[in-house]
Amino acid sequence: MEFEELIELARDSYVGQFVNFADTQLKAYPEGTPEIKVMVAEDSGLYRGLYCADFITVDPEESESPRIIELAPEEEVTFEPIEVTLGEMEMTVEALSWHDMNLTLADAPMPHEGGGVQGIEAWFETWFDPDDVNVDLDSRFSGHIHSLIIDGDNLHVDFGTAPVQALIDLLLLIEMNGCTGVKVF
């Protein structure tokens, strides 16, 4: 199976489970809402302190404060590790967990305050869309990533309901910044 097909399969598997999850939560908590963006403490490690919760509700019997419920996918795409070349960048792909994708970068500046991968801010603005500038009112879900964590040479991304293009754009951005190796797990 080609890398592009694996990405599509990983995304489709996750989003299918997300649809079922959202339906189940809405039945249990009709006042709840899927995909709500929240700001958390800056020291949380989340990029710009932003996070999109899978589902938020208020359960009057338990508390008046919001309750976040996260999807724990039961299925994930499994395959033997593969090697993929993107321009000058060699990738070892061991796993594609759409809701919890980890990328370890080699030989590239990391995106962080004061420097790093050029363009990560614009990528985040596009694919997290903090101000909900690109909202498709005809779509049930946002089509955005749910979080980005930058930790040294590692990126951790919850791609949420974002399309495959979000991952492709991130990989292209990393490659354009001179990264010669990426491990995806």
Q: Where do the language-model regions lie?
A:
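Structured alpha/beta or helical-core interaction and ligand-binding surfaces enriched in interleaved
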Residues: 1-185
